[in-house]
Amino acid sequence: MASESSPLLAYRLLGEEGVALPANGAGGPGGASARKLSTFLGVVVPTVLSMFSIVVFLRIGFVVGHAGLLQALAMLLVAYFILALTVLSVCAIATNGAVQGGGAYFMISRTLGPEVGGSIGLMFYLANVCGCAVSLLGLVESVLDVFGADATGPSGLRVLPQGYGWNLLYGSLLLGLVGGVCTLGAGLYARASFLTFLLVSGSLASVLISFVAVGPRDIRLTPRPGPNGSSLPPRFGHFTGFNSSTLKDNLGAGYAEDYTTGAVMNFASVFAVLFNGCTGIMAGANMSGELKDPSRAIPLGTIVAVAYTFFVYVLLFFLSSFTCDRTLLQEDYGFFRAISLWPPLVLIGIYATALSASMSSLIGASRILHALARDDLFGVILAPAKVVSRGGNPWAAVLYSWGLVQLVLLAGKLNTLAAVVTVFYLVAYAAVDLSCLSLEWASAPNFRPTFSLFSWHTCLLGVASCLLMMFLISPGAAGGSLLLMGLLAALLTARGGPSSWGYVSQALLFHQVRKYLLRLDVRKDHVKFWRPQLLLLVGNPRGALPLLRLANQLKKGGLYVLGHVTLGDLDSLPSDPVQPQYGAWLSLVDRAQVKAFVDLTLSPSVRQGAQHLLRISGLGGMKPNTLVLGFYDDAPPQDHFLTDPAFSEPADSTREGSSPALSTLFPPPRAPGSPRALNPQDYVATVADALKMNKNVVLARASGALPPERLSRGSGGTSQLHHVDVWPLNLLRPRGGPGYVDVCGLFLLQMATILGMVPAWHSARLRIFLCLGPREAPGAAEGRLRALLSQLRIRAEVQEVVWGEGAGAGEPEAEEEGDFVNSGRGDAEAEALARSANALVRAQQGRGTGGGPGGPEGGDAEGPITALTFLYLPRPPADPARYPRYLALLETLTRDLGPTLLVHGVTPVTCTDL
């Protein structure tokens, strides 16, 4: 965790002039020794070559011939608009911080997290691997179109034998050449790319000059077989030179049959071919680990490359429409050779473009693979790809990728691979747009890119357009890619990954939570929508684990805050001892699988700390309304960490960098007879403080005896039938008659009903006990209670029990604390009443027999026992001197009752209105 002494920047401000100092953690290809490429050689050249590919020479006639000039320009504008949206996102992310090796993968993973970044990074890697194979297969086909021997044998220039084995051999030889260049490092790759760029530029220049310099001519088209295999007379296309009639004829669309496939073209199919050729905008970003200044080079170089290729495509569209008739455009996609002043130069351009695309894909794939291996997302599978040379060249990743490309070449399915490659590229582009969109929506202060020509609108459009293009190009491949991404993300989530990168999801959640918390107006609260919002005060969680889980069940969709008071005075301490404890408590919440917030405080006493937490815990309209405490008794604390399966062994203890076991982060339970942090006086005072602050109070006793299946997160399926007993009457001072249920009694009913909504308690039966005096007739009070339960939609079994004279039922209502502030006679009566009430409750639980005076004959020892008992918690006496006596009465009342919740409610929580 960063401290006051941590540097604000990850590099030294003072250093040797003109020397770039790497950020912490940069190594390998991201280190200073490997950063050699300029903007032009590292970004512009590979991006231009990738965006041209073979389309610029072999598909211009296809697009213009079928779509016409106007629709072709519209397609080009739409395609580049989609790409430009992603380019804007790339520029924004690249100028917001130091970009290391891995290009698009690095940007996505450091924004969306390792799960999404790793899954898309692997898919982008596979796309580059397949893209390299597609380029090589296309190059082999182009070579064999000119130099391949036909069925009659070699003749003239057609001397190369053909067939699957020969094609695989040619592809493997070309792959060896490409792999050798990439293995020797980025420097040789940059020089080879620059040489290729010169060849392609020279070839394009010769084509552009030929459009102007060559006069009109007829060009013989490839003959087509006629019906029944008969030969047709030769057909010719016409190069007219600059002619307005030719332009007019080529303005509109004229979709026809593709002579290479026999399929009739339409707007979508032509647009897909054009868009396939325009992808490749990440070629420069993939070299981020070798760039001298990636934050400047990536945006500048990518924008220049996109603008340059767009201009060349537009120029070629216009020149083709002005000079070539539709027959030539539709029947001879390689017509550039026929009109060129020197046709071999066009062939050189075609071969150089395909070769450069394969080199760009292979070296880009190796850099992505090395970044994935360095981040250790896929474990030992990619471990060999971490190896680099002394100069930082990831040669092992190149060889790794070379082997995969060789496997793809064995398949030889060019057309199938092309669609999958494009879809995988689009998934990566959409993820980059989503990353930028997330950063923009999160409104984090540290997201301030120097490139400002973007907004959330452009990012959102980029995501939507990339997804649309995926399904337009290949619906099957698009659906499969999204499914694969989901499976990989699930795998990485299950495996776990580094958490030090930061998650934009956390920033987005903060932004949304803050917005909705501001809308949560406490002045609009209504009892219809009341829900429990609990503050559980815990001294040592090792002894309170069952209560921790029980409180999690009682909250039922409400707020749950886990509070702890550390004793001390900040004036006498060198630092705050509370802050280092948060990690341990958050790990406790994760391991216990409870949905709780953690709030810790430092205070000279537990009582004052509880007051602090009651006042300041929560935020806005989400503040605790109920205090939950463990019961204060002399029972020795149990160490539940030793018996609970979730805590007996540290999770992920075998993973490098995993946190230590929780048993080492919390002290052992208090030994019997040792001093306690809280005395009985302060304990009762804390209860009184909560009631004064208008908070409900729940005291939990013997929660460790709860059946384990009732504390589980499952459905609570068990062969043992349990009861949940509710006594909605103050057993220490019955008042108001047998049918009286006050606000506190209704709160008991509500909490018991909420517990029954939890799956683990579905099978437990709710029983409500109605106490009658020895002279009261049964039936009438039960009917009134059943009517009340019906109005409150509470399903429960009502049982009437007869209590003896000591209950005092039906006495006039008086001050609640009267029994505790009167003479000694009141204490004696209260003690007797507590013993009588305890015997009565025990008799109904099936835990024993013998009620108080005039009590029942005994409980049903053969029937189901009570898993949990809800009792009415009397208000503490007004005189603090009587707090210990009050606590002693509560101890007598709940002695040997098993798991018990003493509940006192101060606010209405039930409503019969719609």
Curated annotation (Swiss-Prot):
Q: Which GO MF term does the entry hold, naming one?
A: chloride:monoatomic cation symporter activity
**Sorted alphabetically, which InterPro entries does this protein's record hold?**
AA-permease/SLC12A_dom, SLC12_C, SLC12A_fam
UniProt GO BP: cell volume homeostasis; chloride ion homeostasis; chloride transmembrane transport; potassium ion homeostasis
| Tissue specificity annotation | Highly expressed in placenta, brain and kidney. Lower expression in lung, liver and heart.
Which ranges does the record list as Cytoplasmic topological domains?
Answer: 1-36, 94-119, 189-193, 284-297, 360-390, 438-466, 762-914
Task: Determine if Flavoprotein is one of this entry's keywords.
Answer: no
Domain of life (superkingdom): Eukaryota
Residues annotated with Phosphoserine modification: S6
Which residue positions carry a glycan here?
A: N228, N243
Stretches that traverse the bilayer: 37-57, 73-93, 120-140, 168-188, 194-214, 263-283, 298-318, 339-359, 391-411, 417-437, 467-487, 741-761
The segments annotated as topological domain Extracellular are 58-72, 141-167, 215-262, 319-338, 412-416, 488-740
Supply the alphabetized keyword list.
Cell membrane, Glycoprotein, Lysosome, Membrane, Phosphoprotein, Transmembrane, Transmembrane helix, Transport
Write out the annotated subcellular location. Cell membrane; Lysosome membrane
Chief localization: membrane
One cellular component (GO) term of this entry: extracellular exosome
Q: Which residues does the annotated region (Disordered) include?
A: 642-678, 844-863
The family line of this record is: Belongs to the SLC12A transporter family.
* Subunit-structure text: Interacts with SLC12A1.
UniProt cross-references to PANTHER family, sorted A to Z: SOLUTE CARRIER FAMILY 12 MEMBER 9, SOLUTE CARRIER FAMILY 12, CATION COTRANSPORTERS
Disorder cited: Defects in SLC12A9 may play a role in a neurodevelopmental disorder characterized by hypotonia, failure to thrive, moderate to severe developmental delay and intellectual disability, pale hair, eyebrows and eyelashes, and variable presence of seizures, congenital heart defects, skeletal, and brain anomalies.
Name of the molecule in the record: Solute carrier family 12 member 9
Q: Which organism is it from?
A: Homo sapiens (Human)
